[in-house]
Amino acid sequence: MGTYKYQAEIDVLIQQGLKMPEVVKPNDLKGFRFVFSSDMSKSYLPNYIMKPQRAIMNGQRKVDVGGYALSCFIEKDKAIKFYHLLAKNMRNIYKTIGDSISSGIVTNNDGNITALASNGHYNLFEFPSCDLSKTFKLEEGKLWKQ
């Protein structure tokens, strides 16, 4: 499995009874990720690092170890489709998950990934040295226009 960038935080959730998902090596898998075009610094942080209160189990929402992983898709079209599906129920989606897409290659040195979901989604559990902001590039065009 390995030690991940947010291993201490993951361990807290595991101690609370949550399970780490099955993971595999990415083997140079293409990745597409939602990003904030105006603030790339927070674009490569997991959900629970950006908003730590989301990792607190209070019975109101489902907490998942994947909150300490980076969400990616294998195809740009699938990412766009998912974004627009979410946008139907999230009025300010561009503030929550971003307004654009970046892409790059996820290598075995970056971390381990979960199995691909039917919509092409996977989570990347980063190794400590991983920094996708250095290897992923912003795609042209915005998903959300304010």
Enumerate the language-model features and the residues they cover.
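Generic detection of intrinsically disordered/low-complexity segments and helix-coil linkers/edges
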Residues: 26-28, 38, 42, 67, ...
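ADP-ribose/NAD+-binding catalytic cleft of ART/PARP-like enzymes
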Residues: 1-64, 146
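Charged phosphate-binding loop/patch that engages nucleotide di/tri-phosphates or the phosphate backbone
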Residues: 125-146
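ADP-ribosyltransferase catalytic core
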Residues: 57-129
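Intrinsically disordered, low-complexity segments enriched in small/polar residues
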Residues: 2-4, 46, 120, 125, ...
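Polar/charged alpha-helical tracts
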Residues: 11-15, 77, 134
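Intrinsic disorder/low-complexity signal
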Residues: 8-10, 74, 139
